[in-house]
Amino acid sequence: MSRIGVKPIIIPAGVEVTIAEGNLVTVKGPKGTLTKQLSAELNIKKEENTIMVERPTDNKKHRSLHGLTRTLLDNMVVGVNTGFEKKLELKGVGYRAQKQGKKLVMNLGFSHPVEMEDPEGITVEAPNQTELIVKGIDKQLVGNYAAKIRAWRKPEPYKGKGIKYVDEVIRRKEGKTGKK
């Protein structure tokens, strides 16, 4: 039995969920609307203010889809209600970031500044020059965009320079020791 899949999803006030033919789920809330095509092999039932995901058989495919489908639905409900955010931190001499309209401009030690356009449904805030906050209602888009920003300069293990998530711990290495 899937421990995650059997948990009911509670729909908070102000969030509206509609399940169409073939498990096309639309979730509307105060922050926006998300639509996702989920696996048609599972049964998604809506009762008053809860959603339940049930699987028809106990074969391996249905077991694996059970928890996944439930988590995707829960992420949609949480996203339209409260939203998701990822915080990034720039460490290094001269590493800076700033917003220019819908563009993110970063100085990361290259010969040119790195410019990134905010994708649809994602907002990036720069409270100061060394912090970035990626916000949105779709958890996958927020995570992917934060990872794209981080990929420009991953943190290196010697001094910790680069772009890292705020809660990320970098395994540090000791540098070379000179002859004595």
UniProtKB/Swiss-Prot annotation:
Entry's Gene Ontology molecular function annotations: rRNA binding; structural constituent of ribosome
Keywords, comma-separated and alphabetical: Ribonucleoprotein, Ribosomal protein, RNA-binding, rRNA-binding
Subunit relationships: Part of the 50S ribosomal subunit.
Tagged with keyword rRNA-binding: yes
Superkingdom: Bacteria
UniProt entry tagged with the keyword DNA repair: no
GO cellular component entries: cytosolic large ribosomal subunit
Family classification: Belongs to the universal ribosomal protein uL6 family.
Record's protein name: Large ribosomal subunit protein uL6
Gene3D superfamilies hit by this protein: Ribosomal protein L6, alpha-beta domain (3.90.930.12)
NCBIfam families (UniProt xref): L6_bact
One of the protein's GO biological processes: cytoplasmic translation
The protein's role, per its UniProt record: This protein binds to the 23S rRNA, and is important in its secondary structure. It is located near the subunit interface in the base of the L7/L12 stalk, and near the tRNA binding site of the peptidyltransferase center.
InterPro entries the UniProt entry points to: Ribosomal_uL6-like (IPR000702), Ribosomal_uL6-like_a/b-dom_sf (IPR036789), Ribosomal_uL6_a/b-dom (IPR020040), Ribosomal_uL6_bac-type (IPR019906), Ribosomal_uL6_CS (IPR002358)
